[in-house]
Amino acid sequence: MTKILFICHGNICRSPMAEFVMKDLVEKAGLSAQFEIASAATSTEEIGNPVYPPARHKLAEHGISCAGKTARQMTRRDYETYDYLIAMDHNNLRNMARFVGSDPEHKVSLLMDHTRRPGDVTDPWYTGDFEATWQDVLEGCTALLEELR
């Protein structure tokens, strides 16, 4: 089983979008039994909060539910548990270092680095552009799944 953890600052916008987009892609490919997919935050600010409403609505526009998801903070144990820890941006990578250290097993990457457009996933918290974030997340998750097949 391949275990993937998507990570952003608060775990209420980008990383849960990636979690549920990837779950949807995996299900549509008939591969659900081969994957465990989750998401987490680097900060404590949003722990216990549901997915931010505009992010939830963007997923729903595409027939994807994130019902029941609440934010949680990543832990050092996540590094041992997951095969891939996928950050949404460079700030997330820096903040993840306190949990994962030097990444000796090379499990950590940026989602967009799996595409032909490396870099950060657009942060809708600052831009308000959930469509741009959707496009980045969909492109990143599609490319990651292709890599892992």
What are the language-model segments listed below?
Residues 1-81, 146-149:
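Conserved active-site segments centered on acidic
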